[in-house]
From Swiss-Prot:
Its cofactor is Mg(2+). This is Mitogen-activated protein kinase 6. GO terms for molecular function: ATP binding; MAP kinase activity; protein heterodimerization activity; protein kinase binding; protein serine kinase activity; protein serine/threonine kinase activity. Activated by threonine and tyrosine phosphorylation. A motif (TXY) lies at residues 626-628. Its EC number is 2.7.11.24. Belongs to the protein kinase superfamily. CMGC Ser/Thr protein kinase family. MAP kinase subfamily. It holds the Pfam family Pkinase. Phosphorylates microtubule-associated protein 2 (MAP2). May promote entry in the cell cycle. InterPro entries: Kinase-like_dom_sf, MAP_kinase, MAPK_ERK3/4, Prot_kinase_dom, Protein_kinase_ATP_BS, Ser/Thr_kinase_AS. SMART domains: S_TKc. One of its GO terms (cellular component) is septin cytoskeleton.
Length: 721
C-alpha cells in the first residue's frame, strides 16, 4: 500500500498525507485529476479532486468552483465535504493564501458510476431515461435558481448510484455565475461545453449565451439515453451545425438570416421542415417523449423550455411534485462576479475572506445597482424580462424579503438559538459528524435550518420519495450483471452502506480463513496425495504375489486402525492364522521328507488358512469402503481361487499333486503364501514355483506384513534352505 501511494505521489503529485489511504484513479474533471480514497477518520470512501494552481487564471477558476460548490446543497448535486491544501492541510480563512498554494484538494461525495459508463452497456429503457431526466431537471432547476451555469453537462458528469437510481450533477470546474439582471455579452468564455452538446446559439455566438445552453445539453443527454449513441456527433463545429440543421427546424426569420451570414452554403429558403426529423433519429419513442424532446431541442433559446417548465411538462407528470423541487435560498449576484475580477489584483485579494462566500452579505436592497445609471440604460438578459418586469420579482426566492422571517422559526423548540447556522463540516473538529449530517440524517435533503427545510420537514417525514420506483431498480440489470456482485445491504443505514471499509475488508479475510479451516477439517479425501502416490506406484516394478499380500495386509491394518472395518473379523482371522501356523511350526521339528509323507495334514491346514484368507478378502470386497490400493490391485489379472473339496486323507496327496496348482479352467495359479510347499517336484531346477516364491520372501517383505509374525517366515526359510 505504501509503495502504491508513493507511486501515485511521484506520477501525479497526489499528496493527501496519512489521513487518506487506498487511492484509486477515477478520471479527469474539468480542471483537475480525480481520485477515490478512504478517509481513515471515518472509514468512508470519498472522491478527491486535485486542482493545480499554476497562474492567476487557474487561481480564479479554482476560487470560482470552490465558491459555487460550497453553497450549492441539493439532493441531485454531488455534495462537497471540505477543501484541503497540500498534504491534507486545512485552509485558512484568508482567500489571499490561495495564491500562495500550488494545489488544492476538494473532498466530495463518492458515487458508484457515471451515466457515460452506464450507456456503454447499451440504451436504457424509456422508464429509466425518464427517471434520470427528471432528476437532472430537478438539479438544474436548483442550479439555475442560484444564478449558476454549469456549462459542461455531459453523461460523464452525471453520477449515478445503481442501488437506488439516484442521479447527481458533478464537476463544476467550468461553471460560472451569471446574474440575470445584467448582460454578459462579450464577457463569457467560449469553447467550454463539449462539442457534441453545444447548442446552436453557442456555435454561432460563443461569447453570448444564457442558461438555455444547459437545457440543450440536457435534451441531447435524454436522447442519448434512449438510443445509446450521441444524437449529434460532429467532427468539428461546422459539421456539428450541419447535423443540427438537418433535424432541428429553424422557425424564426431572424435566426435564418443570422445563419445566412455565417454559413450560407447550408441555408435554404424554407428550413421549417428538416430532412431528418427527430422521429427518424429516435425510432420507437413514445409520442409524449417526442413532444417533450422537441420542446427542449429548439433552435432558438427563447423557444426552449426552462428546467422549471420542463418539470411541469405532461411527460414528467408521474414524477413532478413542485413542493419537492426546491430552489436556492441564497443565489449568487453580480458582486460575486466582481470578486473574481478583484482577485486578479493582489492589492485587493487579501481583503476578501472565505466567510464572504458561505452566505451572501448583501441583499438586493443593499447593493447599489443603479446608483450611476438609469434603469433604461442598464442592459438586461432578454430571458429575464420574458415573463416579469418588476426588479424584485425577478429574484427567485421571494421569502428573502419577508419581515420577521427568522423570528417565526425560533418558536420551534427544536431550534437552538445558540447553534451556528453555518454548516458543521467547516470546523476541523467534529470531522466525523459531517458525513453523518450530510448522508444519514433527514437534514441532508435541504440546507440545514433553512426556511425550505423547516417548511417541508413535516410532509417529508410522512411522504415517501415520490420519484423512487423499486421496479425500475429491479429492471436495471444489464449494467448490474457485468459489475461485481454486492453483498446484501438491506436494512442498513447509509453510513453502514458507505462506511466501515476497513472493517468489511477484515471481515472478508476472516471469513476466508474460516472457510479454509473448515475445508481442512472436513477433508475426507486428499486428491493431491492420491495422485502423488499413484505416480509413485506406477514407477515401481510390478509387485509379486507376496508383495500384493503384504500391501493388502497393510491396507487392512490401516482400515482397522481407522475403524473402517469391524475389529472382530480381523481378530478372528488373525487368531485362526496364528493357530494354524503354530501347528505347522510344531511339525517343522521333523524332517522335510516326513512332513511331505504324512498324508498332507500340514498342507491341508495351510490350505484351510489360505481359504479363510480368501473368504475375508471377499468380505472386504463386498464392503462399501474400498481403498485405492485395493482398487489398484483388483485391476491385475489374478486367477480365481478354488475352495478345497472335502476328500479322504489317503487321497489327499495324490489330488494335491495333480490339482493343487490348477483352477477350473486349467490355468496354473500361485498360493499367495505357502501352498507351494506341497509340490513334490520342488527339487526340479526348471519351472519350480517354489524357487520363485522363495526368491520373493526377502526380509523386507516379511517385515512389511503385520498379520504373519516374522518368526514363522524365518522357520519356513530355515527348512527350505
Amino acid at each position: 500500500m505504501a509503495e502504491k501511494f508513493e507511486s501515485l505521489m511521484n506520477i501525479h503529485g497526489f499528496d493527501l498525507g496519512s489521513r487518506y489511504m487506498d487511492l484509486k484513479p477515477l478520471g479527469c474533471g474539468g480542471n483537475g485529476l480525480v481520485f477515490s480514497a478512504v478517509d481513515n477518520d471515518c472509514d468512508k470512501r470519498v472522491a478527491v479532486k486535485k486542482i493545480v494552481l499554476t497562474d492567476p487564471q487557474s487561481v480564479k477558476h479554482a476560487l470560482r468552483e470552490i465558491k459555487i460548490i460550497r453553497r450549492l446543497d441539493h439532493d441531485n448535486i454531488v455534495k462537497v465535504f471540505e477543501i484541503l491544501g497540500p498534504s491534507g492541510s486545512q485552509l485558512t480563512d484568508d482567500v489571499g493564501s490561495l495564491t500562495e498554494l500550488n494545489c488544492v484538494y476538494i473532498v466530495q461525495e463518492y458515487m458508484e458510476t457515471d451515466l457515460a459508463n452506464l450507456l456503454e452497456q447499451g440504451p436504457l429503457l424509456e422508464d429509466h431515461a425518464r427517471l434520470f431526466m427528471y432528476q437532472l431537471l430537478r438539479g438544474l432547476k436548483y442550479i439555475h435558481s442560484a444564478n449558476v451555469l454549469h456549462r459542461d453537462l455531459k453523461p460523464a458528469n452525471l453520477f449515478i448510484n445503481t442501488e437506488d437510481l439516484v442521479l447527481k450533477i458533478g464537476d463544476f470546474g467550468l461553471a460560472r455565475i451569471m446574474d440575470p439582471h445584467y448582460s454578459h455579452k462579450g464577457h463569457l468564455s467560449e469553447g467550454l461545453v463539449t462539442k457534441w452538446y453545444r447548442s446552436p446559439r453557442l456555435l454561432l455566438s460563443p461569447n453570448n449565451y444564457t442558461k438555455a445552453i444547459d437545457m440543450w445539453a440536457a435534451g441531447c443527454i435524454f436522447a442519448e439515453m434512449l438510443t445509446g449513441k450521441t444524437l449529434f456527433a460532429g467532427a468539428h463545429e461546422l459539421e456539428q451545425m450541419q447535423l443540427i440543421l438537418e433535424s432541428i427546424p429553424v422557425v424564426h426569420e431572424e435566426d435564418r438570416q443570422e445563419l445566412l451570414n455565417v454559413i450560407p452554403v447550408y441555408i435554404r429558403n424554407d428550413m421549417t421542415e428538416p430532412h431528418k426529423p427527430l422521429t427518424q433519429l429516435l425510432p420507437g419513442i413514445s409520442p409524449e417523449a417526442l413532444d417533450f424532446l422537441e420542446q427542449i431541442l429548439t433552435f432558438s433559446p427563447m423557444d426552449r423550455l426552462t428546467a422549471e417548465e420542463a418539470l411541469s411538462h405532461p411527460y414528467m407528470s408521474i414524477y413532478s411534485f413542485p413542493t419537492d423541487e426546491p430552489i436556492s435560498s441564497h443565489p449568487f449576484h453580480i458582486e460575486d462576479e466582481v470578486d473574481d475580477i478583484l482577485l486578479m489584483d493582489e492589492s485587493h485579494s487579501h481583503i476578501y475572506n472565505w466567510e464572504r462566500y458561505h452566505e451572501s452579505q448583501f441583499s438586493d436592497h443593499d447593493w447599489p445597482i443603479h446608483n450611476n445609471y438609469e434603469a433604461d440604460e442598464v442592459q438586461r438578459d432578454p430571458r429575464a424580462l420574458s415573463d416579469v418586469t418588476d426588479e424584485e420579482e425577478v429574484q427567485v426566492d421571494p421569502r428573502k424579503y419577508l419581515d420577521g422571517d427568522r423570528e417565526k422559526y425560533l418558536e420551534d423548540p427544536a431550534f437552538d438559538t445558540h447553534f451556528s447556522t453555518e454548516p458543521c463540516w467547516q470546523y476541523s473538529d467534529h470531522h466525523e459528524n459531517k458525513y453523518c449530517d450530510l448522508e444519514c440524517s433527514h437534514t441532508c435533503n435541504y440546507k440545514m435550518r433553512s426556511s425550505s427545510y423547516l417548511d417541508n420537514l413535516v410532509w417529508r417525514d410522512s411522504e415517501v420519495n415520490h420519484y423512487y420506483e423499486p421496479k425500475l431498480i429491479i429492471d436495471l440489470s444489464n449494467w448490474k450483471e457485468q459489475s461485481k456482485e454486492k453483498s446484501d445491504k438491506k436494512g442498513k443505514s447509509k453510513c453502514e452502506k458507505n462506511g466501515l471499509v476497513k472493517a468489511q475488508i477484515a471481515l472478508e479475510e476472516a471469513s476466508q480463513q474460516l472457510v479454509e479451516k473448515e475445508r481442512e477439517k472436513n477433508q475426507g479425501f486428499d486428491f493431491d496425495s492420491f495422485i502423488a502416490e499413484t505416480i509413485q506406484l506406477s514407477l515401481q516394478h510390478e509387485p509379486t504375489d507376496v508383495d500384493k499380500l503384504n500391501d493388502l495386509n497393510s491396507s487392512v491394518s490401516q482400515m482397522e486402525s481407522k475403524g473402517l472395518i469391524s475389529k472382530s473379523v480381523s481378530r478372528e482371522k488373525q487368531e485362526k492364522g496364528m493357530a494354524n501356523l503354530a501347528q505347522l511350526g510344531a511339525l517343522y521339528q521333523t524332517s522335510w521328507e516326513s512332513q511331505f509323507v504324512s498324508n498332507g495334514e500340514e498342507c491341508f491346514l495351510i490350505d484351510q488358512f489360505c481359504c479363510e484368507v480368501r473368504k475375508d478378502e471377499q468380505v472386504e470386497k463386498e464392503n462399501t469402503y474400498t481403498s485405492y490400493l485395493d482398487k489398484f490391485f483388483s485391476k491385475k489379472e489374478d486367477a480365481e481361487m478354488l475352495e478345497p473339496e472335502p476328500v479322504e486323507e489317503g487321497k489327499l496327496g495324490e489330488k494335491e499333486r495333480g490339482e493343487s496348482f490348477l483352477s477350473n479352467s486349467g490355468e496354473l495359479f500361485f498360493n499367495k503364501q505357502l501352498e507351494a510347499i506341497g509340490i513334490p517336484q520342488f527339487h526340479s531346477p526348471v519351472g519350480s514355483p517354489l524357487k520363485s516364491i522363495q526368491a520373493t520372501l526377502t526380509p523386507s517383505a516379511m517385515k512389511s506384513s503385520p498379520q504373519i509374525p516374522h518368526k514363522t517366515y524365518s522357520s519356513i526359510l530355515k527348512h527350505l534352505n
